[in-house]
Regions:
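Zn-dependent metallo-beta-lactamase
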Residues: 1-25, 29-34, 38-42, 218, ...
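Active-site neighborhood of phospho(di)ester-bond hydrolases with catalytic His/Asp-centered motifs
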Residues: 25-27, 57-69, 88-92, 149-154, ...
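Binuclear metal-ion centers of metallo-dependent hydrolases, dominated by the metallo-beta-lactamase
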Residues: 99-117, 163, 186-242
Length: 242
């Protein structure tokens, strides 16, 4: 029987991937200290910290960068105390002395994982001039026959994304700010050539005080192209099967 893949929205920029028996979580141990987005749902975190449920004993934990709304050290420490994890990809520059094994990438920034999965990274600067000194690690995942690209809070630097021109990308995960910017949309269309776009890193609708959802829907209506499929992820459980 052919293996099926699954990508699931947890909250904010947290995405769970599963292919066969291999489980990966991206930016899933975080805390919204700035109160601009939504917290990791309490029931989800309680299960994780006890080593129970679908998000227990994840094989790989990946983090795009060191901001609290993507990576929260106390949560990682507690998770590792109660769960078995095969590998970590910590934020660039993070000095970690806790439990866990860091993944070793080759010179091309690539590493093979079980079940034919390939993980690759691209480092770009963080969005917003005040955060340009923060390195954001984008993750490209070849999983089954699909190629997923997670941009985290990556900035719209054409010269950075030129490094992965030609890599197949079936679905890209971007912030509403990236999609809102003309340079961001140019990267998606002309460099990455991607037709399925998931706008994530959004608060839950009832907590969206800055109206990110309204802005994004307006942008889709105004700037979207006929051959593009753009969807919003702002509820736990939204998913893609492949």
């Amino acid at each position: 029987m052919e293996k099926r893949g699954l990508a699931v929205c947890i909250s904010n920029a947290a995405v769970f991937l599963q292919y066969g028996e291999t489980k990966i979580l991206i930016d899933g141990l975080y805390k919204d200290l700035g109160r601009n987005f939504s917290e990791l749902p309490e029931k989800v975190w309680e299960s994780m910290r006890r080593g129970e449920g679908e998000l227990s004993n994840l094989d790989y934990l990946l983090f795009t960068h060191s901001h609290y709304d993507h990576f929260y050290v106390p949560y990682l420490q507690e998770y590792l105390e109660h769960n078995e994890v095969k590998g970590l990809c910590l934020p660039p520059g993070e000095r970690w002395r806790g439990k866990g094994h860091s993944l070793s990438f080759d010179e091309e920034g690539k590493i093979p994982l079980p079940e034919g999965i390939t993980l690759r990274f691209l480092d770009v600067r963080h969005l917003d001039k005040q955060f340009y000194d923060v390195v954001n690690r984008c993750f490209w995942v070849e999983i089954g026959k699909k190629h997923l690209l997670f941009l985290g809070d990556g900035d719209y630097q054409e010269e950075a994304f030129e490094k992965i021109r030609g890599l197949p990308v079936d679905t890209v995960f971007v912030t509403p700010i990236f999609y809102n910017n003309a340079k961001g949309r140019k990267i998606l269309r002309e460099i990455l050539g991607v037709k399925k776009i998931v706008v994530y890193h959004l608060p839950f609708p009832e907590e969206d005080t800055l109206h990110y959802e309204r802005m994004t829907r307006r942008d889709i209506e105004k700037y979207g192209e006929k051959d593009e499929n753009v969807v919003l992820w702002n509820r736990t459980g939204q998913s893609i099967l492949f």
